[in-house]
Amino acid sequence: MENENQVIDMKKEIQIRKMKKSDLPQLQEMYRDLIPEGVSMEVLENNYYRTVDRPEYFLAVAADGDKVLGSTMGIVCIALDAPFLVVENVIVSGECRGQGVGRKIFEALDEFALKNQCEYALLVSSGFRKGAHRF
């Protein structure tokens, strides 16, 4: 049996891809770190369908095959002087924090921002997430 405390080098296997509906059950569990009271599958599905095909939204997961390791949402907003990116719901699974998943997520966000000519990005985070703020 594999040692649960073993650090696994997943850097080569991590893929950043568009979020799929089938990812939502795993995300629902991960979102408990973001929203302690949880979020219903109905809300997740409704908001997924409202945003997934909109070009100004970047809904992505970091995955190893079908296993979701992390997720994020980026939204391009248009100000009068220039577009900018709002980054929300960044989450990395506790079992793979510190192994490059968050870095790959932010690299993908950077690419999306550049593609959309964003001048800057704003990261939204809840005040209680002190551990995540160290990242």
Which residues make up each language-model segment?
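Acetyl-CoA-dependent GNAT
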Residues: 18-83, 88, 106-107, 112
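Residue-level recognition of the GNAT/N-acetyltransferase active site
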Residues: 20, 93, 126
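Conserved acetyl-CoA-binding loop-helix of GNAT-fold acetyltransferases
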Residues: 92, 98-111
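Conserved GNAT acetyl-CoA-binding A-motif
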Residues: 113-125
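Conserved N-terminal entry element of GNAT/NAT acetyltransferase domains
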Residues: 1-22
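Loop/helix-junction capping segments adjacent to catalytic residues or to phosphate/diphosphate-binding pockets
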Residues: 81, 99, 130
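Conserved beta-strand-loop-alpha-helix junction that forms the acyl-donor binding cleft
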Residues: 123-133
